Structures are given as C-alpha cells and as structure tokens.
Regions:
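Conserved, carboxylate-rich catalytic/transport cores that coordinate ions
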Residues: 1-8, 15-30, 34, 293-295, ...
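Long, charged N-terminal accessory/stalk domains
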Residues: 1-391
Length: 754
C-alpha cells in the first residue's frame, strides 16, 4: 500500500513477419506501457504504420463526427456486437449520407430562422413609426431615413443644411422617419451627410411592401413553418440516433482499436527485417505476458524481462535490478548497457542481448485495497505519487475521516454525510472522480457518526448522552464532550492539547517517510541531515514543552489534561525535567530535550543551511493542528446557536459549574428545579415556546440553520482537514510527478470478438 506496484521493463524482439501477430496479442493483454523509441540507435528507425492505418483513422474521424451530430453517449448503446469491415463499408456510408443530409437541412433551417428573427427585431422600429414599408423607399426626388435620435437636433441640422430644400419628420415612440427633398445640385446621399452630426442612428429600411404589422405577421408565419419543418428534421435525427447509436459506438470502438494496433509500430525500433518493442508491465504479470506471446508466435520472438525498478542508495530516482533468468524461461541477464549507470546500449535485433531504449521513469500503479482506493483522488488532486516515493493514500484513509469526524462529531450530520457519500459512490460508476469522492464522503460520514455517538449528540442535541450514556450505560455524561458550557471548559482546553499531540504524531510519520525515502534513494547522511534533524528538533522541543522544566510558565491545562483528575485520565502529568546543568545567566536548567533540539538544529544547519532559518517550523507546524480543536468548537457553537434559537436554553448552577440545557419539552422558570439542579438563568426562551408565528419562524430557523451548519462542515472541517494533509503532512516528504500507467490495449465496452 505504501509502495506502488512493482514494475518491470520488458523487451520483445523479433522478425517483422510476426510483428502484426505480436501487436495483436500484446494489445489483447492490455499490459504493456510502451516506451517510445526516440530514433537514437544507429541502424534503427521508428516503424511505419501498418496497412490500413490511414483508412481506419479517416473512418474514425467520420464516426466521431456522426456521434457529435447525433449527440451520442455511452448510455445510448445497446448490447455488445461484432463489427466487421464489410459492415463498416456498407452501413457506415448509408448512415453518413442520411445523417449528413439531415444535419445540412437542420443547419439550413436554423440559418433561415435566425434570419427571420433578425428581420423581426429590425421591423420593430418601423411598427413603432407606423408607416407602410413601401412608402419608405423607391423615390426619385426624395431621400428617406429611419432611425433613433433627438428630434430637435435632427430638425436643427436639416434647417441649417443648404442642400435640403424641404423635409418632414414623422415620429413614433422612439423612432424618427425623415423625408427630405435635396436641392437640385446636391450630392447623392446628402441626407445621410446632414444627419451625421445630429445624434441620429440610422436603421436599414427593409425591401418590403405593406404595413410593418403585415410584414411581421408574414415573417412570423414563415418562421412557424420553418420551425415545424425543423422539428420534423430533429425527429428524424432522433430516430436515426436510436437506430444507429449501437452501431456507431461499436464502430468507434473497433476503429479505435484498429488505429491503436496499426499505429503501434511508430513506437518500435525497426530495421528492414526486425523490430524491437519495449515497455513497462507489472512484474507479477511477466510470466502471463511471456506465455501469451509465445502461444501466439512460438519461438520466433525473444521476450526478456530486462530490469525491475527498485529503490537503492545510488542517488538516482530509481535504479535497475538485474533479473535472474527463469528456469525454462526466455528472460536473459541484463548486461551493463541496460543498467542505470549510463552505459551505452548496443542495439541488436537477433535477441543476443537485451536493449534499453530509454532510461524512463516507471509508471506508477497505486497498489491500494478497495476500501482505501477512493482516497487516491485526494492524493492525485496534488499529484500522482512518483514511483520512487511512498504513496500516502493509506495515511489519508486513516487520518482524514478521523480529523473530519472529530471536528463535526454529530450522529445526525454523520448520517447525512454518509447518505450523500453512498449516493455518489453507487450512482456514478461511470465517473471515477465522483465515485471516489463518494467513498471519501461516506468514510467521513461514518467517522462523524461514531464521534457523534461518543459526544452524545444528534443535530447538536444531547439526546444520545441523555438516553444512552446516562440512561442505559449509567454514566454521568457522554464519554467525551466538546466543552461549550462553563462546566465543560476543561474539555475545550483538553482538545487543544490533543490537537497538538495529534500534530506531533502526524508530523513524525511524515518526516519518518522522508527519512526512509532519503535512506533508500541516497544514504544515511542525507536522511539524517534532511529529515532526522527535523525529527530531533520537533520531538526535543515538544518533550521540553510538556516537561516540568516549564511548570509554572506554560498553561496548567497542558499538564492536567491527562492526569488522574483530568478529562482524559491517562495518568500522565508531564515529562520530568531531565536537567543536565543550569544556565548561569538565566538561572534555568538546560535539559536533555533541549540538547536533542540543539543537536537537530546543528545537523540541519550543516546539511541544509538554507533551511536552518525555518527551524521554528517545528513549533508552527504543530500549533497549526490546533485548528482541529478550533473547528470542533466553532461547529459545535453554530449547532448550539441554531438549537438555542428554536428550543431555548436554560442554565443550572452558576459560575464555573454552570451547565446549559435545551428546553426540549418546556422552558422552566428561574428558581425552579430541573433534573435535581436549580435553574439560575434563561439564556433564551426559544421560538418554539412562543406563538404560532414564532413557531413557524423557528422551524425555518431550525431547518435552514442545520442545513447551513451541514454545508459549512464541508468548507470548514473538510478544507481544514485537507489543508493539514496537504500543507503540513505532504510537504515533509511528498514530491509527486508520477507517470500514469497507460497500457497498450483497450477495455471493450461496445464490441465483442466472439
């Protein structure tokens, strides 16, 4: 789980006479992540596409264009089918003619309808003007302009124009119609020239007759006819979609497979008579891979497991592990050219020695069990893990839901989150990202419900505490509390301490991962300087903080939270002082934890001097985890406020012993007894205890308030938990940048070969 699946570099070398059979077999196995040949070997060239590649590519483009026209998706497919070349020749051509013809007609109709809509938009000013369209054009001695503008400005411009002998202006609500008789010696289009400076915007006069209303009615009737015809064409296309969907989807799949197979030689190193193909496969699949090819072509190819990617102390990202020959197998020894030492590879097509095309990074196949796999989406949101580093998915699986559940901690909210997650997980099987987020949400909801039971809360009400922990189990209160009321303030302080301890543990794991990675990739020196130093500093500092050396200086609750009388009675009251000597100037003990911190700082300064200025990160990063307690109290406070407004809250006892209670059944008066305690104060009477109107308002407040708390739980608890994982945890060891495993093959969905 912490390491990706082991990958092996394999080579397939053989005669071109069997290349097509090898390609078909390898494609069917869907195992080989092919390494692209870069043309660097003398005497070897990238292969040429097989016969039919161009034809298949052209057909594939045609099929996808038809699918786009018909708006097909995977849900439109019928049962799987066999698609033959003859069917492609005949049926595809017929479908193409019908669909393209209908699509052309649809586009033509849509264009005509758009033109009519433009005409109708244009005719509106003329309807406002109220003059027949045939009266607005066709004159020999008059010029006409229609548009919008300021009438007084237009008339002033016309009055001052010597080139205009006479004019008349007609007006509608927003439209002006101007009829002008130019002088005998005036230039053509003189009216347009006069109106240029008159704040007038001209509108093109349509070439039509009759009133604007008649013209608009005629065009609307024409549009109705075209829309009816368009509906008919759409119905024919929908019918064509129903009839052709299964064939087109299956044809696309077959042609995609054909294109993959025929273009595969482009990645091979070839001569006139031989080929070499290389790539990565999961190591445990090599025997199956080898056997399948040998069954297909016999001994006319040489199949070798050239190397296995592993970790080592040679300073490289990954190195090659020699593969011992299998008894009876064809795997050969890896010569020095195939190692990761930069040796030159001698390219031979006779299988005499293994050949490495490229010292490429192995693809990363995350090796996580089913229940953990949805959390890969959170890791890949940052980056796919590199093959050389730990996959932190399992850690996110163990910590993210716990962080989230602890911060929300409510059975009601947990059930809702779990239901949402279950819905996403079960209804989006064809959308892996949504399905994975559903799995994450489901886990977060389960932990929220578990912590809600421990807190004794359901939608912010302490009903579980009352009826389960106090009524059935017989406890005085729930096993743990959030600490909102004055009587429970020690819990709130205790959660701050717990948050710090969680941060220390979480960061220890992160730097241990980094330590192991540096140890495997480099050496002990790198591991100690880059990660061991931080481990020493962080643990030294926080052991010192939790030791008696700071007693009387640090807050008392740091030492009392876990004492026998504390809220979490584990019997821990702090570490001993562990003094080594007294510092003369400040008269304070220099302790063993401080020495450990100092050693870590010196190691960091020697190994990574630039990072030494960030030594306080061991304090800051850990304190960042107190956001867990902060969000816990904030979310609890929001739910408490919503319930306070609806049910009301009364107080029993006073001062540091004061406890808050919701008025679920009724609101007692001050001075009366409730559950054996005197009511000392009413914080709020509660909308539910008022009139019918306040009850209605209260119901709205209750529903909307809890929905808001539910939504903000994602944006607060969810984002804060993710931030702790990404910023505090990942930054200590995770680089990412891994390559996705893309095997040569196809997962058939619409076709079958049988």
């Amino acid at each position: 789980m912490l390491r990706p699946e082991r990958m092996s570099k394999v080579s397939v070398t053989g005669s071109k006479a069997v290349m097509d059979d090898v390609v078909e077999t390898v494609h069917g196995l869907n195992l080989l992540d092919v390494t692209e040949y870069d043309g660097s070997w003398e005497g070897f060239d990238p292969g040429d596409p097989a016969a039919g590649a161009e034809e298949s590519s052209g057909r594939l483009v045609t099929v996808r264009a038809l699918e786009s026209i018909l708006d097909l998706d995977a849900n439109d497919a019928g049962p799987t089918r066999i698609v033959t070349d003859d069917a492609l020749d005949e049926e595809l051509s017929e479908i193409q003619d019908r669909v393209n013809g209908l699509d052309d007609r649809r586009k033509e109709l849509e264009s005509e309808i758009r033109a009519i809509d433009d005409d109708l938009d244009t005719i509106e000013p003329f309807r406002d003007l109220g003059i027949d369209l045939d009266l607005l054009s066709g004159y020999d001695t008059l010029e006409v302009a229609v548009g919008t503008g300021d009438r007084s400005a237009v008339e002033a411009a016309l009055d001052g124009a010597a080139a205009i002998d006479a004019y008349e202006v007609f007006t509608g609500s927003d439209t002006l119609g101007i009829f002008a008789r130019p002088a005998a010696d005036a230039d053509a289009d003189v009216l347009d020239d006069v109106l240029v400076g008159a704040n007038f915007t001209a509108i093109e006069i349509p070439d039509a007759e009759g009133s604007p209303e008649e013209y608009a009615d005629k065009r609307e009737h024409e549009r109705d006819r075209l829309e009816s015809e368009l509906d008919t064409v759409d119905a024919e296309l929908e019918s064509e979609k129903t009839d052709a969907a299964g064939f087109l989807l299956a044809a696309e799949e077959k042609l995609s497979i054909d294109v993959q197979r025929t273009e595969a030689p482009l990645s091979f190193a070839t001569t006139d008579n031989a080929f070499i193909a290389e790539g990565w496969i999961p190591s445990e699949e090599f025997l199956e891979f080898e056997a399948a090819i040998e069954d297909a072509v016999g001994e006319r190819v040489e199949i070798e497991e050239l190397e296995r990617a592993r970790f080592s102390a040679d300073g490289t990202d990954h190195v090659r592990e020699d593969v011992p020959a299998e008894p009876g197998g064809s795997g050969g020894e890896v010569g020095s050219p195939a190692a990761a030492d930069g040796g030159a590879a001698e390219a031979r097509a006779d299988g005499g020695s293994p050949v490495v095309m490229d010292d490429d990074e192995p693809p990363t196949v995350q090796d996580n069990p089913g229940v953990v796999k949805p959390f890969e989406v959170l890791v890949e949101a940052v980056s796919r893990p590199s093959y050389r580093e730990f996959d932190p998915t399992i850690v996110l699986f163990l910590t993210f839901p716990a962080f989230f559940g602890f911060m929300i901690g409510d059975l009601g909210y947990g059930i809702v989150y779990a239901a949402i997650g279950y819905f996403l997980y079960t209804n989006f099987e064809d959308r892996p990202a949504f399905r994975s987020m559903g799995g994450v949400t489901l886990a977060a909801g389960i932990f929220t419900a578990i912590f809600g039971i421990l807190y004794g809360e359901i939608f912010g009400l302490h009903l579980i505490a009352t009826y389960l922990w106090e009524g059935v189990v017989g406890l005085a209160h729930a096993p743990i509390e959030k600490g909102l009321s004055p009587a429970g303030v020690d819990w709130a302080r205790g959660w701050l301490v717990v948050s710090v301890l969680v941060g220390i543990f979480h960061l220890n794991v992160a730097w241990l991962f980094g330590f192991i990675e540096d140890l495997e990739l480099h050496d002990l020196e790198h591991a100690v300087y880059e990660n061991g130093s931080w481990l020493l500093m962080m643990n030294g500092l926080w052991v010192w903080v939790f030791s008696d050396a700071l007693a009387g200086v640090a807050p008392e609750f740091i030492y009392t939270t876990f004492t026998a009388d504390g809220v979490l009675p584990l019997g821990f009251a702090g570490f001993p002082t562990m003094a080594l000597f007294t510092i003369p100037v400040v008269d304070a003990p220099f302790t063993l934890p401080l020495l450990v911190f100092l050693i870590g700082f010196v190691l960091l300064a020697v190994g990574e001097p630039i990072e030494a200025i960030e030594f306080l990160n061991v304090l800051v990063n850990v304190l960042s985890y107190t956001r867990i307690a902060a969000v816990l109290l904030a979310k609890a406070g929001m739910a408490f406020t919503v319930n306070l407004l609806f049910f009301g809250v009364y107080v029993t006892e006073s001062g540091a012993d004061a406890e808050w209670h919701f008025g679920l059944g009724h609101m007692p008066e001050v001075g009366t007894m409730s559950s054996g305690h005197e009511v000392t104060e009413i914080l709020f009477g509660g909308l539910v205890h008022g009139s019918a109107a306040t009850i209605l308002v209260g119901v709205l407040v209750l529903v909307i308030g809890h929905l808001l708390v539910l939504a903000l739980g994602v944006t607060s608890a969810g984002l804060q938990a993710v931030r702790l994982e990404y910023v505090e945890f990942f930054n200590k060891f995770f680089d990412g940048g891994g390559r996705e495993y893309e095997p040569f093959g196809y997962d058939r969905q619409f076709t079958t070969e049988d």
